A protein has these predicted regions:
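Short conserved loop adjoining the S-adenosyl-L-methionine
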Residues: 77-82
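Class I SAM-dependent methyltransferase SAM/SAH-binding core
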Residues: 26-76
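Short catalytic micro-motifs in class I SAM-dependent methyltransferases
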Residues: 92-93
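Conserved alpha-helix/loop element of class I SAM-dependent methyltransferases that forms part
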Residues: 1-13, 30
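A conserved beta-strand element that flanks and buttresses the S-adenosyl-L-methionine
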Residues: 89
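A short glycine-rich, Lys/Arg-flanked "PGG" loop and its adjoining helix->strand segment in the class I
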Residues: 101-116
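Short N-terminal helix/helix-N-cap motif within the alpha/beta-hydrolase-1
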Residues: 26, 98-102
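Conserved class I S-adenosyl-L-methionine
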Residues: 14-23
Length: 116
């Protein structure tokens, strides 16, 4: 079940996207069906979830010429370049993170100016 309405966004120009706190990857899968020729990144602190996603997406049928990268790490300190993402998703994460404002600062830091 999706908890985010991707249909409310204009995704045609999205070429880089990250799901901050991606968990089981449900938003990554939705993006995989909606985007083409995009670099899609998932980051989570759970090594189990990241390992599972790496295995699952290596054979994922909704590739649409997308590339996927999965990072294990702290969502309060994301190892992604400043102003590099067209779309940042952070769904059902903030309530689980101490100092959630640090997560919001990171999301803003990696988001391209004028992006979503």
């Amino acid at each position: 079940m999706e908890t985010f309405n991707f249909n409310s966004l204009n995704l045609k120009k999205i070429k880089t996207a990250i799901d901050v706190g991606c968990g089981n990857g449900r938003h990554l899968k939705s993006l995989g069906f909606r985007l083409s020729n995009a670099k899609i990144i998932g980051i989570d602190q759970s090594v189990q979830e990241i390992t599972k996603l790496q295995n699952e997406f290596s054979e994922h049928i909704c590739k649409n010429q997308n590339s996927y990268e999965f990072l294990m790490g702290d969502v309060r300190s994301i190892e992604i370049e400043d102003n590099s993402q067209d779309l940042v998703i952070c769904s059902e994460v903030l309530e689980h993170v101490p100092n959630f404002r640090d997560v919001l600062k990171e999301c803003y830091r990696i988001l391209k100016p004028g992006a979503v």
